[in-house]
């Protein structure tokens, strides 16, 4: 159930260039395999517990990966609480310290704002150890409210949907929001 998805840079008319792989658990695949008629996200607290458990499995899997395919340039979707856990400390101890700067930890915006103090602690610790922080779960209409520099995130990740093109066309300040966030720091 652990999947990979490439994050690429598109510069001008050049072909996309892979920057890193996102490592994640497909909740849809998990649901289809275990409980096809159940919405795993319906109960936020139960879903949080599920994702915290999945985070720990992903950390264990990545830190024990011995085929060399995850030796740099990858990201993981994690909960803020996972970064503050013993399992993350174990993960941190098990990886080569030189790899940390090529690992991006993606944190959901809703998780960040549910406990901003925990986020600040987790972010500060992770960045001190050398990891990059990506603020994930931002929709086009919320971008204007997010200040990447104030949150001290290294990257912003926008959830994309084709209908967002209408919002972009209607919002004359959208380019300003993108420029404020810095294009090169957006996914």
Where are these regions (language model features)?
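Bacterial c-di-GMP phosphodiesterase EAL domain
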Residues: 1-97
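The catalytic core of metal-dependent phosphodiesterases that act on cyclic dinucleotides
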Residues: 96-187
């Amino acid at each position: 159930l652990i999947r990979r998805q490439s994050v690429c840079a598109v510069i001008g008319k050049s072909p996309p260039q892979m920057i890193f792989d996102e490592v994640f658990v497909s909740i849809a695949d998990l649901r289809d395999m275990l409980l096809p008629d159940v919405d795993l996200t319906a109960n936020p607290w139960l879903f949080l517990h599920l994702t915290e458990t999945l985070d720990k499995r992903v950390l264990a899997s990545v830190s024990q990966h011995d085929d060399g395919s995850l030796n740099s340039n990858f990201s993981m979707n994690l909960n803020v609480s996972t970064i503050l856990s013993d399992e993350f400390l174990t993960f941190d101890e098990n990886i080569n310290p030189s790899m940390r700067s090529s690992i991006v930890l993606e944190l959901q915006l809703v998780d960040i704002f549910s406990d901003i103090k925990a986020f600040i602690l987790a972010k500060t610790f992770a960045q001190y150890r050398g990891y990059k922080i990506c603020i994930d779960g931002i929709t086009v209409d919320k971008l204007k409210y997010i200040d990447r520099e104030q949150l001290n995130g290294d990257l912003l990740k926008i959830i994309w949907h084709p209908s967002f093109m209408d919002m972009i066309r209607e919002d004359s300040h959208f380019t300003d929001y993108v420029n404020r966030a810095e294009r090169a720091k957006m996914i």
